[in-house]
Design a protein with these regions (language model features):
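Internal alpha-helical scaffold of NAD(P)-dependent oxidoreductase catalytic cores
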Residues: 4-38, 44-84
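Interdomain hinge/lid region at the active-site interface
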Residues: 32-37, 86-107
């Protein structure tokens, strides 16, 4: 888990030890609200990556490449992203991700 914290430096230093115990990455982004800005920007990039991966896999399949093979290629090439390796939106590429569970809830 990554924490993106927006507050003054003094308050950040006061709570950092608690956050480090809960997450792998802790960043002080600046003043109040900057943590949310960082989160929104990160989520925008994630959304774009998910859309690009979905479109690329669909195009590849329509042109004759097995989506599993194409995902394997992408995961070791310049198109690699967290989406390909950890949260692939294409069903049956990765186990235990929402797309492979018909988007049913659960952890």
């Amino acid at each position: 888990m990554t924490f993106m914290v927006g507050c003054d430096k003094e308050n950040f230093e006061a709570v950092k030890h608690v956050l480090v115990g809960m997450g792998k990455n802790v960043f002080h982004c600046g003043g109040p609200g900057t943590g949310e800005i960082a989160k929104i920007c990160n989520n925008l990039i994630l959304g774009i990556n998910m859309i690009a991966l979905s479109e690329g896999l669909s195009l590849g399949e329509k042109l004759g490449i097995d989506p599993k093979v194409l995902s394997s290629i992408i995961s070791v090439s310049t198109g690699r992203s967290w989406c390909v390796d950890t949260y692939n939106p294409r069903p049956n590429i990765l186990e235990n991700v929402p797309s492979s569970r018909d988007y049913n809830g659960g952890f």
